[in-house]
Amino acid sequence: MQPAKAETSSEWRQGRDPAGLKALDPRGYEVVPVAAPNKDELARHFLWRFWKNLPKDGHIAIFDRTWYGRVMVERLEGFCTRDDWTRAYNEMNAFEDELVGCGAIVIKFWIHIDKDEQLVRFTARQNTPSKQWKITDEDWRNRDKWDQYEIAVNDMLKYTSTPFSPWHIIESNDKKYARVKTIRIINDTIMDE
């Protein structure tokens, strides 16, 4: 699937572990996995590390984790101040508005699973030798903060879903349903441009 004309297309996926962010065939796309910022990235504005990975015209980039970590992980773990993360909502909206204004197609997904399904998937990972590498103590620690993350997620969706860059909620307790819904949204959005 290629964007119409020479537009840039970016898809941003954010969600709880293990909501289903990894099941993606990257052929034909630039996939940008996002981990914790390194020393060089920490010395710059938090959006810089994303800006440098934006796709060139006519290409598609998929960000697996995004700058929205600023208002979730960084907020809850104390990696930034309250002023930093509250200001970030407007900074992220302005960033996305600028991208859309330059002709980019922006598609944002919140990949959602409920708490019971997360436990099922965590337990399956823990009990399956070939998948044990996917589960860490940090995953369990973050699960203990479910309610705090729920507040942060709701704030993120409330303050950053805009007419030019709306969030699409993907219910992913059923992985096949989630994949079909995601593909339909991507197709419909690109075809509408």
Please provide the spans of the model-predicted regions.
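Glycine-rich phosphate-binding loop of ATP-dependent small-molecule kinases
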Residues: M1-E193
